[in-house]
From Swiss-Prot:
This is Unknown protein 3. It comes from Zinnia elegans (Garden zinnia).
Length: 8
């Protein structure tokens, strides 16, 4: 997958 993981 492409993109950043944004788990806050």
């Amino acid at each position: 997958v492409s993109g950043v993981a944004d788990e806050r």
